[in-house]
């Protein structure tokens, strides 16, 4: 209940709690990942979103594990939020923002390709807003891959 109030509240007291949660989004995401190993917890998150459909899905999206265990698809929770709330612009915007929150070393191309693979799976999504978001994001990722490929080639040529 306390976290729900912090994530959903609109009063000044809840803004401080939200700020604290946002200060360490990486740790928050890791906490949610560990909590969501139990399928009943997943159902509770979805129920909470159903109880507060105008605010909860967007509040929780930045803290969800993005990918399944194999890393080749979006997580079940992300897909469920898109299925139920994918017409909410803020949900889609926050999913896009979450794509840039993981860390990497070396060439970033593999990371973009992983994201592109997951986003491409949304091209036939039942919600039009999700399909539009996926097309736009897919185009952006392809451009980033192209740009980074050129950068990697230039960097490689410098060190020959």
Task: Report the location of each language-model feature.
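Non-catalytic all-alpha helical scaffold/repeat segments
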Residues: 1-160
